[in-house]
Design a protein with these regions (language model features):
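Helix-loop junctions and hydrophobic alpha-helical segments within the transmembrane domains
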Residues: 154-177
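Re-entrant/interfacial helical elements at transmembrane boundaries that shape
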Residues: 11, 98, 132, 145-152, ...
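Internal alpha-helical transmembrane segments of multi-pass membrane proteins, especially GPCRs
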Residues: 66, 70, 74, 99-100, ...
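Structured non-transmembrane domains adjacent to transmembrane bundles in polytopic membrane proteins
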Residues: 1-92, 101-114, 118
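Hydrophobic, glycine/alanine-rich multi-pass transmembrane helices and their short helix-loop junctions
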Residues: 81-85, 137, 170-234
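Membrane-proximal cytoplasmic C-terminal regulatory module of class A 7TM GPCRs
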Residues: 226-248
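Membrane-water interface of transmembrane alpha-helices in multipass transporters/channels
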Residues: 90-99, 117-133, 192-207, 214, ...
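Hydrophobic transmembrane alpha-helices and their membrane-interface caps
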Residues: 93-148, 225
């Protein structure tokens, strides 16, 4: 440790053997703060103690994110539901869109935990699920809206629900698959990085986009739209008139 010339300050350096963003490094910040607080109380010090450095900064950021991100998730999903309700004129289709995208996110989180935590013995960096949620919600919604609006166009042209689904898949399914392969493959190139965090981000985003574009959008979404039938397009009357005038 270092002592200031006036004897009022002491600086101690603690070196951990893990990456700054790892959970173990940030856990060491909490342990150090608790130990200093207990020692100060026992010794009766009238002094302040601070734990600083990259892990401490990241720990504080992680703490704020953990406490607020759940509300952000809810707010974003409510906003997206409202926008999709206005765009599609349907009560249930926006719910189906959000559910299928979250399905891809949940599958990816499970695979990420399996591969990195259980197989490779690494920790899943706390920021990876946040990045995954934000980017998948944007990219996955693009693919979903592209297919759903094509189905909607078929309904407006007078197709039955199943014929509209088949027509939409024939017109847009290949485009969605190609875009997913390009985007997913691009993210997967991060696996060659030497950084565990970049590897996890690349794997998570690449896997999620491939699952969404190769499985969820071409198969799960049409299957659910088939099961929902005409309920897919039930919505406010004024929006139904705007989007094609389907009857109840």
């Amino acid at each position: 440790g270092l002592v200031s010339t006036d004897g009022r300050y002491i600086q101690m350096m603690i070196i951990v053997g893990d990456e700054p963003m790892s959970q173990r490094s940030m856990d060491s910040v909490a342990l150090a703060r608790d130990a200093l607080a207990r020692y100060s109380d026992q010794m009766g010090w009238m002094a302040g103690t601070w734990v600083v450095g990259t892990p401490a900064i990241l720990y504080d950021i992680s703490d704020v994110v953990d406490s607020e991100f759940s509300w952000i998730e809810v707010g974003v999903m409510v906003l997206i539901y409202i926008l999709l309700l206005l765009v599609l004129g349907s009560y249930l289709t926006p719910v189906r869109s959000l559910a299928t995208i979250m399905m891809s996110v949940v599958w990816t989180l499970g695979m990420l935990q399996l591969v990195f935590a259980h197989v490779l013995g690494a920790e899943v960096v706390w920021i990876v699920p946040i990045v995954l949620f934000v980017i998948c919600l944007g990219l996955g919604m693009d693919y979903d809206i592209l297919l759903t609006t094509r189905i909607r166009e078929g309904k407006v042209r007078g197709f039955s629900n199943d014929d509209a689904i088949r027509d939409a898949l024939a017109r847009s399914g290949g485009i969605i698959t190609l875009c997913g392969l390009i985007m997913g493959g691009t993210f997967l190139t991060l696996l060659i990085s030497g950084s565990t965090m970049l590897q996890e981000i690349g794997f998570a985003l690449g896997f999620a986009i491939l699952v969404d574009s190769l499985l969820v959008v071409p198969y799960v979404v049409p299957a659910l739209m088939h099961l929902m039938g005409d309920w897919s397009w039930k919505g406010p009357r004024f929006l139904r008139r705007i989007h094609g005038g389907e009857s109840d």
